[in-house]
A protein has these predicted regions:
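Active-site neighborhood of phospho(di)ester-bond hydrolases with catalytic His/Asp-centered motifs
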Residues: 48-50, 73-81, 97-101, 159, ...
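Divalent metal-coordination and catalytic microenvironments
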Residues: 24, 39, 49, 64, ...
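C-terminal regulatory/interaction regions
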Residues: 253-316
């Protein structure tokens, strides 16, 4: 039978860490589960990525309330994935901010992604019944926008295509703190099911050029030294580059998706096999890399049905 879509042994409780990165920036991290960023301005709070459900978002709010009673006015979406955005309603924010490309992806595939992600990661959608529906941005921007939370300058930048075509980073230029979303992972496997693998390294270079002193990845610990930041950037870049090269050479040799998957697993397992969700991500990652190598620029939409078909093809 097809392997269960939910990662094996994925029901374990994850320890939450709420770490201070600067006087006004915090990271909510959970041992490789999706992270949330927090910026506290003079009179308002910004939340970057929401957690998957309103009930899960309540824990973020509880941590925020331990350090400030200022209202949460802004939610920023790093990209469109359900696990990042569907907790938004809990915050009661005035505005939900996303790139134009992210809003287009919500229109095009948000509902399908919601249904397939809930099936893939039941544990990450605790109290799924509290989700009121898709999260819709109230403000979009094409390339970048700047928000001032009093004296705190917040740059919201569509850095380029990578993890998705809508990827957005949040940069505090004075503090030199960067919230990368899933463009960077640390000790966790990049999910590439909606990725643009050939563009991703150039997008990472734009992040590197900012010279962050601290970086909050999409998954994994907050990186709080320049050395750790570079490790996060370099590790992510190495994974996506090796993945694409391994799959491309097999696709160009007209090998099947199954052959490309087996070959890529064998090549990447020694170095990356201990990263969180490696076994879970690789089928999606290889599927997208294979399509991209075959010239499919626009990632095909994942549905719950396509998930199951793909697993069956790769398990046989």
């Amino acid at each position: 039978s097809a392997r269960s879509l939910a990662p094996q042994n994925d029901l374990a409780y994850k320890k939450i860490t709420f770490s201070k990165l600067s006087d006004n920036a915090y990271a909510y991290t959970a041992e490789g589960d999706p992270n949330t960023g927090i910026v506290i301005g003079d009179d308002a709070v910004m939340v970057i990525d929401t957690q998957a459900t309103p009930v899960m978002a309540q824990d973020v709010i509880r941590r925020i309330r331990e350090v400030t009673d200022k209202p949460i006015k802004y939610v920023v979406l790093s990209h469109y994935h359900a696990v990042r955005v569907l907790g938004a309603s809990a915050y009661g924010a005035d505005h939900v901010i996303a790139s134009e490309a992210t809003r287009e992806m919500i229109v095009e595939r948000g509902q399908q992604d919601y249904l397939s992600e809930v099936q893939r990661f039941p544990r990450l959608f605790r109290s799924v019944e509290t989700i009121p529906g898709l999260t819709w941005p109230t403000i979009t921007f094409k390339d970048r926008m700047t928000l001032f939370l009093g004296r705190t300058e917040v740059q919201i930048i569509h850095a380029g295509r990578g993890h998705t075509r809508g990827d957005t980073i949040v940069w505090l230029p004075k503090e030199r703190v960067l919230f990368s979303g899933d463009l960077v992972e640390y000790g966790a496997t990049p999910y590439c099911g909606d990725a643009h693998l050939q563009d991703w390294p150039q997008t990472l270079q734009k992040l590197r050029d900012l010279k962050p002193l601290a970086l909050v990845p999409g998954r994994g610990d907050a990186l709080t030294t320049e050395r750790a930041v570079e490790d996060g950037l370099a590790g992510t870049q190495a994974f996506i580059t090796e993945l694409y090269e391994e799959v491309k050479k097999r696709a160009q040799a007209n090998q099947s998706l199954k052959q490309a998957y087996d070959g890529a697993m064998q090549a990447l397992q020694p170095r990356y096999g201990n990263w969180v969700i490696f076994e879970h991500c690789m089928p999606f990652d290889v599927s997208r890399a294979y399509d991209e190598a075959k010239g499919i620029d626009h990632p095909r939409i994942w549905t719950a049905e396509r998930d199951i078909e793909m697993w069956k093809a790769l398990e046989n």
